[in-house]
């Protein structure tokens, strides 16, 4: 009998996180969803999974989610780290408190969850971690200062983690969305994309699905742009 596959999705109540949960469920994963609203619990109920209302800025909330997942299914095959929105302001006007909030929202959200699932994946001798990041980490924009700064740090963290745990068959990769339809659309932004359109949350979820699959088993430590050609770096 095939082993059940289990995925945890944080910040999974709406947007790219929710769409990733739906796609992984369709792929056959049992899903456990954390969200700060009640939407994650409602979505989990719809998908036959577990929902916890809480925040990925809380070690206790994340532990409740992991413990509930292990109690129900006894394993965690995939962790998808999504995030909310951090502070935005002119670069020198961002306060210390706002920088610390950005750190919590965009980097510590991953680190906290990873600390909890890594021993479980080590015991299983397998696991994959997928972080939904941003296309602006290597070509930063003043529009998203705290996101760009801390998710650039996430890229470094991902490479170190991937190198550390590759031999134990644990992978970590980042998905780098550009302009996605979960954001308000403007003609200026649409016109900046070579493909001439916004991406969809479903396209991000499809990328997450691939990275969680056996077909991506030789991919780790990577930053995969899903941006319609927006970023110019090669």
Named regions from a protein language model:
Residues 90-91, 95-103, 129, 189:
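Substrate-binding pocket helix/loop in short-chain dehydrogenase/reductase
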Residues 80, 166, 171, 219-221:
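Short, small/polar-rich loop/turn modules that mediate ligand/substrate recognition or access, typified
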Residues 94, 140-148, 160, 189:
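Active-site loop-to-helix junction immediately N-terminal to the catalytic Tyr of the SDR YXXXK motif
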Residues 119, 163-164, 217:
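Alpha-helical segment proximal to the catalytic Tyr-Lys
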Residues 13-14:
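Conserved glycine-rich cofactor-binding loop
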Residues 139, 209, 220-234:
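Short C-terminal tail/terminal secondary-structure segment
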Residues 114, 150-151, 158:
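Active-site helix of classical SDR
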């Amino acid at each position: 009998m095939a082993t059940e596959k289990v995925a945890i999705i944080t910040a999974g109540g709406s947007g790219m996180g929710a769409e990733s949960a739906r796609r992984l469920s369709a792929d056959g994963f049992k899903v456990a969803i954390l969200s700060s609203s009640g939407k994650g619990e409602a979505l989990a109920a719809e998908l036959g999974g577990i929902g916890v209302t809480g925040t990925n800025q809380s070690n206790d909330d994340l532990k409740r989610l992991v413990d509930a997942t292990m109690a129900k299914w006894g394993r965690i095959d995939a962790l998808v780290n999504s995030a909310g929105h951090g502070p935005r302001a002119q670069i020198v006007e961002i306060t210390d408190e706002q920088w610390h909030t950005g750190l919590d929202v965009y980097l510590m959200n991953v680190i906290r969850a990873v600390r909890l699932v890594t021993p479980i994946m080590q015991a299983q001798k397998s696991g994959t971690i997928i972080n939904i990041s941003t296309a602006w980490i290597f070509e930063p924009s003043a529009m998203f200062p705290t996101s760009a700064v801390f998710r650039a740090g996430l890229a470094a963290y991902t490479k170190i983690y991937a190198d550390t745990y590759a031999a134990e068959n644990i992978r970590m990769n980042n998905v780098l969305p550009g302009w996605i339809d979960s954001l308000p659309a403007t003609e200026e932004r649409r016109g900046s994309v070579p493909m001439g359109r916004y991406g969809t949350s479903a396209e991000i979820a499809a990328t997450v699905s691939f990275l969680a699959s056996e077909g991506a088993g030789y991919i780790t430590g990577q930053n995969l742009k899903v941006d319609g050609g927006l970023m110019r770096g090669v």
